[in-house]
Amino acid sequence: GKEKMPKYWLPWLVGMPAETSLAICSMIFGGVFEKFKNLKVCFSHGGGSFPFTIGRIEHGFNVRPDLVAIDNKVNPRDYLGKFYLDSLVHDDMALKYLVDLVGDERIVLGSDYPFPLGEHEPGKLIESLSSLSAESREKLLWKNAAEFLGIKQSI
């Protein structure tokens, strides 16, 4: 199917989210997070398709451990909230789902700047999400990124 990808800008629309999910699954199934317990990683594009296909991924892990759980016996769902994701999902319902799925502690502001699919007003989606508390908004807009980078926050 590679020959179909350039048409309709598909590498950017569906390829990148798929590649991000592939990277997450490869790190989980390869045991990277088990081997490097203190590893801090942030995946762009809200984790790509990974958060939205976690049910399918977990089901595959459970029904075909002979193919999936070869190098790591930990359920992939157990990793939700253990690595960071950015907020660049371009959809209020998707961002709400992401927060509900992984919590507000591991999502950081994503802009994708300077690329054409970047958020034109970084943070606007976060600020517009009425289901987020003021505290959660602050976490997503800057506090989580400061924590990820090891920047001390003074009060």
Give, region by region, the residue ranges found by the protein language model:
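Histidine/acidic residue-rich metal-binding segments in metalloenzymes
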Residues: G1-D78, M93-E105
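Short beta-strand or tight-loop elements
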Residues: G81
